[in-house]
C-alpha cells in the first residue's frame, strides 16, 4: 500500500494573529447586534502594549471599540505584561471611517436594494471542501491540529496545567492512503506542540503534561503507535509570547481557518467582514455545498468553487470536482448544486442567517470556521439533496 504524509497546523486563541481575528469579529458581532444591516470591514493589529482597530464601518449602532478590545483580550487571558499583553493597561488606538460611498452604491444601493438584488461586496473566488475521512467531513490532519490547540486553551483555563500561557501553536502530520481519490488516514506520523509557558516549569514537565492532558484526550489511540514522533516545545523555551513576542494582524491565518492546506483557498480572509463580503459568505455557502454533496453520498470527497464581480448578485462561475469519487458525473453534481444553493450574497445572508449578532462570529475566529458542532455555524447544516443512484 503506497502512502504519503500530509501536515496541517493550528494556533491558539492567544496567538497574536488570532487575537486580532477575534477582536475584528467581536467588533462585527457588536455592530450586527445593534444594526443587522451594518457594513463592516474591521482590521486589527497588535504589538507590545498596543492594539489598533481600523477600517471602514457604517452602522447605526453605538460601538464602544475600546471596551470590545479590552474585553476580548481579557477573556483570552491577556491580563498582565508577563503573558504578553495587559488588557487593562495597553494602548488602544481606533481609526474607523465609513464605507466608501462608491462601494455602497454599487453593492447595496445605499440600503435601497432588495436582498436578491444585493451585489457582491468585492470580486473574488472562494472554495468549499469536504471529505468523508472524519465525522466532521473535514481533513483529519486539520481536525487534530485544531483540537489540540483548543485543548491547550481548555487545560490552561480550567487549571489542569497552570503553567500554560495563552500563546501556542500545534501541527500534525498524518500518513494517508489514496483510495481512488478518497483520503484514508492510516496513522499519525508526527505531533508538534509549541506552547507559551511560565518560568516555573521544566521542559520535562511540559512534555509529560502535554502528552497526558492534551494529546491523549484528543488523538484517538488507533492513530498512535511506537513510531509516532513527538516534538513538544522543541525550541526549549517559550516564555515570551502574545503580542510581546510577535506582531499580530487580522487575516493572516486563513488556512488554519479553513481546511489546513487541503482543497484550495481564494485568498480572502473572514474575520471582521459583514455578510456582503463574499470572502466570508461565499466561502460559507460553498462549504455547505461541498459537505452536503459528501454527506448525501454523492461523492467521498469534493471541492466547490464560486466566483463574483463587485456589485453583481449572480456568481460568475460555479465549479465542482469530486476527485474521481463521484457516484454520478461531476457535471450532474454541478446541476444539483446550482438547483439547491442560492449563491447571491443577499440570499446567502438570509438562508444562513448571517446578520445575527451576539458572539456568533467571535466563536469562528479561533479553532476554525468549519467542522464545528455548534448551531450558530449554520453553514455546517447538511442540506438533503435528491439524486438518482445509477443502476448497478
Curated annotation (Swiss-Prot):
GO terms for molecular function: ATP binding; metal ion binding; methionine adenosyltransferase activity. This is S-adenosylmethionine synthase 1. CDD domains: S-AdoMet_synt. Homotetramer. It catalyses: L-methionine + ATP + H2O = S-adenosyl-L-methionine + phosphate + diphosphate. L-methionine binds at residues 56, 99, 246, 277. SUPFAM superfamilies: S-adenosylmethionine synthetase. Its EC number is 2.5.1.6. Gene3D superfamilies: 3.30.300.10. It comes from Populus trichocarpa (Western balsam poplar). The gene is METK1.
